[in-house]
């Protein structure tokens, strides 16, 4: 298939996707979403100036920029896009689907005038910097490569509506669980074992797998002690070998693991402490309310579920790097939050939408071949996919007028449904 024809089909898919995403929204919002999804991918940037350039309008660039900025500042846009993505994605969520939550940062080291900017821990540099936090949820299946971005919200502890980090976590849990009918198991890293978070999961009858720091006190056989002390005394009768990619190398880990039934003080809910040795000097401690039997298969299922969580780190790097997220240059808090919803939608398009049907899978393979990389396509194919989309759309803009006509046709058809 000729690359120009693939580029044309990509534009058609972007239009179709944006139409599903913006269904029921006003005409001007539908057009804005379509243009933003196109611009972010063709320029691999979240800067409004770059998105405006991609549209190649026959008016001064500043006027296009002003129009995009005005629409990006719409109240309620983040929630509308997020709920539209829920509608599209929640059919993928099954009883055993993992709902992996991660708190990340967007460092803005040299920014001075961005609204409600706070001090955050810049994980890539290992130091405190100006910026914002993001709360992200990605759905995954154990043993499968498919990852489904579900939720992404930017927040700052300096914003007037901020209450606490836990409240941001509860907001994400509440919104996702409501849409999935409480299906899936939540997976959180260290810090997720705070008593407030665990009580929330138990009160809402949600399944979870949380990594413990070891300080949390639990009860085992009527005795109260720290998770760490109980982990040290746990028998580890089973062994398993795992291979983890670290950088460009593979590292082999030989793991020993076991389980103990425990309870939280003041609660009757049965929990299980899964203990794993082999990742380092200290044991890895997982707390879960999922039923666990004293068998290799049952215990390993919990460990394998948590290990799957590592893949979300690569997902977040993909989103940050492929769309240059830390180069975001928006002065108002609402626009920053709305842009995160658009980036989430772009990630969903690249990671999920292009793989939903056989024809789209074929298209995805063609796009992968268009991403010219020195060492070929990496195992994490979304990087190459994003590069391929950018390459095709950027190099084959001959049909861009037809793309704009498709936007106008779509928004005209949607006019009947405008509120």
Regions found by a protein language model. Give the residues of each.
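Single, function-defining residue in the core of a domain
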Residues: 1-45, 54, 84, 97, ...
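Short, basic interhelical loop/turn and adjoining N-cap
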Residues: 54-67
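Active-site-proximal, Lys/Arg-enriched surface segment
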Residues: 37, 65-142, 256-261
């Amino acid at each position: 298939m000729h690359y120009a024809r693939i580029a044309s089909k990509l534009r058609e898919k972007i239009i179709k996707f944006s139409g599903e995403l913006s269904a029921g929204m006003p005409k001007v919002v539908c057009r804005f979403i379509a243009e933003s999804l196109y611009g972010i991918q063709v320029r691999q940037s979240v800067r409004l100036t770059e998105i405006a350039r991609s549209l190649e309008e026959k008016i001064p660039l500043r006027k296009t920029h002003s129009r995009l900025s005005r629409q990006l500042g719409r109240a309620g846009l983040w929630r509308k896009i997020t709920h539209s993505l829920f509608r599209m994605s929640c059919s993928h969520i099954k009883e055993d689907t993992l709902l992996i939550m991660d708190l990340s940062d967007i460092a803005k080291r040299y920014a001075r005038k961005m609204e409600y900017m706070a001090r955050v821990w810049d994980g890539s540099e290992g130091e405190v910097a100006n910026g914002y936090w993001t709360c992200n949820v990605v759905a995954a299946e154990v043993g499968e490569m498919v990852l489904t971005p579900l939720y992404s919200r930017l927040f700052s502890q300096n914003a007037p509506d901020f209450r606490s980090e836990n409240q941001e976590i509860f907001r994400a849990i509440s919104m996702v669980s409501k849409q999935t009918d409480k299906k899936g198991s939540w997976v959180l890293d260290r810090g997720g074992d705070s008593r407030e978070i665990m009580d929330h999961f138990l009160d809402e009858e949600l399944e979870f797998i949380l990594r413990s720091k070891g300080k949390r006190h639990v009860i085992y056989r009527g005795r109260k002690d720290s998770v760490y002390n109980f982990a040290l005394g746990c028998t580890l009768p089973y062994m398993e070998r795992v291979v983890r990619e670290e950088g460009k190398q593979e590292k082999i880990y030989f793991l020993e693991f076991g389980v103990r039934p425990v309870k939280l003080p003041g609660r009757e809910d049965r929990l299980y402490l899964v203990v794993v040795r082999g990742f380092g000097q200290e044991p890895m401690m997982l707390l879960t309310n999922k039923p666990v039997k004293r068998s290799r298969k049952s215990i390993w299922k919990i460990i394998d579920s948590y290990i799957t969580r590592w893949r979300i780190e690569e997902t977040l790097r993909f989103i940050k790097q492929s769309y240059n997220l830390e180069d975001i240059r928006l002065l108002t808090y609402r626009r920053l939050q709305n842009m995160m919803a658009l980036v989430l939608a772009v990630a969903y398009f690249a990671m999920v939408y292009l793989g939903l049907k056989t024809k789209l899978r074929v298209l995805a393979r063609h796009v992968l071949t268009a991403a010219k990389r020195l060492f070929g396509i990496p195992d994490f194919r979304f990087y190459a996919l994003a590069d391929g989309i950018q390459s095709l759309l950027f190099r084959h803009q001959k049909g861009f007028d037809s793309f704009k006509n498709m936007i106008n046709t779509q928004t005209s058809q949607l006019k009947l449904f405008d509120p």
